[in-house]
Every structure is written in structure tokens, then in C-alpha cells.
From Swiss-Prot:
Residues 80-83 are annotated as: Involved in Mg(2+) ion dislocation from EF-Tu. CDD domains: UBA_EF-Ts. Belongs to the EF-Ts family. Associates with the EF-Tu.GDP complex and induces the exchange of GDP to GTP. It remains bound to the aminoacyl-tRNA.EF-Tu.GTP complex up to the GTP hydrolysis stage on the ribosome. One of its GO terms (molecular function) is translation elongation factor activity. The keyword Protein biosynthesis applies. It is found in: Cytoplasm. Keywords: Cytoplasm, Elongation factor, Protein biosynthesis. It comes from the Bacteria. This is Elongation factor Ts. It holds the Pfam family EF_TS. HAMAP family: EF_Ts. PROSITE patterns: EF_TS_1, EF_TS_2.
Length: 307
């Protein structure tokens, strides 16, 4: 058995683009033969997968799943929208979303969770990259839970049940009848998909974002040429408006365009004859915050020729 050195592992990694542990295993399996190790990685699809992993993945699917009083949302990205229609990819997203209910929303822990049929989520993802032919990434996950009540899932324009481009979870705590909670929860979920709140409450808004809005408002108000005290009131008003428009409980319900969400919940509780509290929510929009690569056809061909 040839000695597998760190230098050899490093060289193979540079040749193949595969991970360190995969390179070490390849060298072990081929008794240190570098070219044979490259071929071994290629036959396993690992070299190809690693090469594809450098490409931007900003399409894909968001999945939502609920079990009892717990819900999970997961985003898995691919390079093109075409892959989102692939049955194998859809099955993977659906399965990982269900696994998140027990594995939790730490992406590293979820990636290391056991996948049905053997291996881990991460290993299944690597296999999918090789077989489907596009880079894919497990981007994020979020789990919400209530002690008593319900978690309501919603997918806007679902590609298939539970999967789409915008996934929402609404966590409602209380002792009101579950059917009544699910009705108002579905309405609020649709509101969240459309209104894009940044936090549950005004106090939950990012202070950095608030200060940025304050600075913008101050600059605009200063241009008015009004007295300082008037300028300050203008700034305060602009910030208050921003807070109200971006905190879920303060937002005006999109369905009637007049009732704050907090009041919508209170009205539902009163009508149901029980308590309902909007405890938490999740809104995942596919590719949100990812800068997509743009290139023309000629550039793509040239890139492919260069390898």
C-alpha cells in the first residue's frame, strides 16, 4: 500500500476540484496512482460535481412541510429553472424539507443528516449534481414550532404540492379551534407572500436598516429648506411609516387594505371564541439575495470549450 501524502491529496484536489476527503479516498482506492485516482473520482461523479459546484445556483425550489405543531421551510438552489421541474430534484427538496422537521434548521447539521436509502443529505446532493448535470446547493432552512396551536404552510404558485418559488409558514399559538386558526393562518400566509414583511414586530426590525432609512429621510427632509424642528418631525414620520410598513403585525392586511394584521388576528380569535397569537413566521423567496451570473451564448460556449 503506497503512502498517501498530504502533497498528493493537494495535487489531486487541484487536478479534479473534488473535496479533500474524496481525494484521499480516491488515492487510497488506487494505491496512490494519480491518474487512476482522477478516473476513480470521475467514475463516482465527484470530480464533475466539484467542477460544477463553482457555478452560481440561483434557481431551484423552496419547500415547506408541517407535522403536528412544527413546520419547516427549506431552499435548495440549482443553476436553471429547468431543473426545478426534474422529478429527482423535486423529490430531494421534498425529502430534505421533511428531514428538517427533526434535524433542525442548522444547514450544516441538516446536510449531515441521514438520507433515506443510505448516506447523508450532502452525499445525496453531490450525487444529484453529477446525475442531473447542474450545480445545486442546500442554501437555508428554518423551523418554527408552537406548544399549542398550529403551523400553517403556504406556497405561492406551487409547482407541485409543497414546492414553489415562495414558501411561507405561519405559527399560531392558542386554544382556538384549529380549523379556525388554519383559516386565518392561510390568509395571513398569503399576505406575507405578497407584502414581504422584514420582521414580526417593529422592535424586531434590524436597527441598521432603521438607521439607514433615518439617514435617507433626513437627507430628503433637509432639502426641503424647512426649519430644523419641522425637518425632525418629517424624519420621525418617515421612519415611523417605514416601521409600520415592514413589521408584519403592523402591516395593513392586503385583502381589505385597511386592517392591521394584529387586529386581523384579534378579530379571528374573538370570532373563534378562543385565544390566537401570531408567534412567528417564515418567508423564503427563491434566490433572494443571490447575485445571478449573466452571460451571452457566445461567452457560455467559449467557457465550455475552455473547460
Amino acid at each position: 500500500m503506497a503512502e498517501i501524502t498530504a502533497a498528493a491529496v493537494k495535487e489531486l484536489r487541484e487536478k479534479s476540484g473534488a473535496g479533500m476527503m474524496d481525494c484521499k479516498k480516491a488515492l487510497t482506492e488506487t494505491n496512490g496512482d494519480m491518474e487512476a485516482a482522477v478516473d476513480w473520482l470521475r467514475t463516482k461523479g465527484l470530480a464533475t460535481a466539484a467542477k460544477k459546484s463553482s457555478r452560481t445556483a440561483a434557481e431551484g425550489l423552496v419547500g415547506v412541510s408541517v407535522e403536528g405543531t412544527k413546520g419547516a421551510a427549506v431552499e435548495v438552489n440549482s443553476e436553471t429553472d429547468f431543473v426545478a421541474k426534474n422529478d429527482q430534484f423535486q423529490d430531494f427538496v421534498r425529502t430534505v424539507t421533511q428531514l428538517a422537521l427533526t434535524a433542525g434548521d442548522d444547514v450544516a447539521a441538516l446536510a449531515g443528516a441521514g438520507y433515506p436509502g443510505g448516506g447523508t443529505v450532502a452525499e445525496k446532493l453531490t450525487s444529484n449534481i453529477a446525475t442531473i448535470g447542474e450545480n445545486q446547493t442546500l442554501r437555508r432552512a428554518k423551523v418554527v414550532e408552537v406548544s399549542k396551536g398550529t403551523v400553517v404552510p403556504y406556497v405561492h404558485n406551487a409547482a407541485v404540492p409543497g414546492l414553489g418559488k415562495i414558501g411561507v409558514l405561519v405559527a399560531l399559538e392558542g386554544d382556538a379551534p384549529v380549523a379556525e386558526m388554519e383559516t386565518v393562518g392561510k390568509q395571513i400566509a398569503m399576505h406575507i407572500a405578497a407584502a414581504f414583511p422584514q420582521a414580526l414586530t417593529e422592535d424586531g426590525l434590524d436597527p441598521v436598516v432603521i438607521e439607514r432609512e433615518r439617514a435617507i429621510a433626513a437627507e430628503k427632509a433637509a432639502e426641503s429648506g424647512k426649519p430644523a424642528e419641522i425637518v425632525e418631525k418629517m424624519v420621525q414620520g418617515a421612519v415611523a411609516k417605514f416601521r409600520k410598513e415592514n413589521a408584519l403585525l403592523s402591516q395593513v392586511f392586503v385583502i381589505d387594505n385597511k386592517t392591521p394584521i394584529a387586529q386581523v388576528v384579534a378579530n379571528a380569535a374573538k370570532a373563534a371564541g378562543g385565544s390566537i397569537t401570531l408567534k412567528d413566521y417564515v418567508r423564503f423567496q427563491l434566490g433572494e439575495g443571490i447575485e445571478k451570473e449573466t452571460s451571452d451564448f457566445a461567452a457560455e460556449v467559449a467557457a465550455a470549450v475552455k473547460g
